[in-house]
Amino acid sequence: MAATRLMPTEEGQDLIDLTREICDKELRPKVDDAERAAATDESFPTEVFRTLGAAGLLSLPHPEEFGGYGQPYEVYLQVVEEIASAWMSVAVGVSVQSRAAYPVTTFGTPEQQSTLLPDMLSGEQLGAYCLSEQQAGSDIGSMTTRATTDDASGEYVLRGRKAWISHAGHADYYTTFARTSDDGGKGLSCLIVPGDATGLSFGTPERKMGLHCDTVREVVYDDVRVDASRRIGAQGQGMAIALSALDA
């Protein structure tokens, strides 16, 4: 029996109805086979995310001027709950996708927003949120992944590793936080790393009891070059961006 939802707007109820329809037609018929396959062959439900993106369900909390739905979080979170009732791995992925795009919608320049957000919010590009490291989980100020500037090209050069990253190896872009100076928490910056960047690689998927379609791996940056235009916010603003995204 479906939960009775108290929604703040009529549009919110329409979104719940749409979500339930998609869950019944697209998610529930696929979940068991997909989870079973992903436990052994690292398959990933990319097309499911494209379906959700085409329906607008990957952009609910993002502003309308960027292609989002501009919905309050009490609507967005109830939509995620509905998805979780059908396929928990996909619900986790919806949350990851929203968080990966959040720095661009909130801290990006107008040019970055117009260039990056259409594919991010439509589901054409899947994102990963790369913050945690083996020695820097809750204390992100102790991260060691570093981005240095190549004076000749102006590019950032990334070296280091991120741990426990959902969508690693399947994402089209990696919202990455790295150290750009040794000034503690004030020395972090945020970069959008293309998924096909040279030097980007991934560890073996974590073995889990469930949520097999939520692929979790280490992300390795081996002299990965990132154009300076893909830095989000000011240099040194990474801590504020990361904490804001986690609060959102």
What label would you give each PLM region?
Residues 85, 136, 163-169, 247-248:
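Glycine-rich phosphate/pyrophosphate-binding beta-alpha loops
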Residues 19-27, 108-115, 154-159, 190-200, ...:
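Long, well-ordered alpha-helical segments
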Residues 155-203:
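A short core secondary-structure module
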Residues 123-131:
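A short, Trp-centered hydrophobic/proline-enriched beta-strand micro-motif
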Residues 92-111, 137-140, 149:
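N-terminal glycine-rich flavin-associated loop
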Residues 3-15, 85, 202-248:
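Glycine-rich beta->alpha junctions and the first turn(s) of the following alpha-helix
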Residues 135-138, 164-167, 180-182, 208-215:
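Short Gly/Pro-enriched turn/cap motifs at secondary-structure boundaries
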Residues 1-94, 115, 119-122:
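Amphipathic, small/basic residue-rich leader segments at the start of a protein or domain
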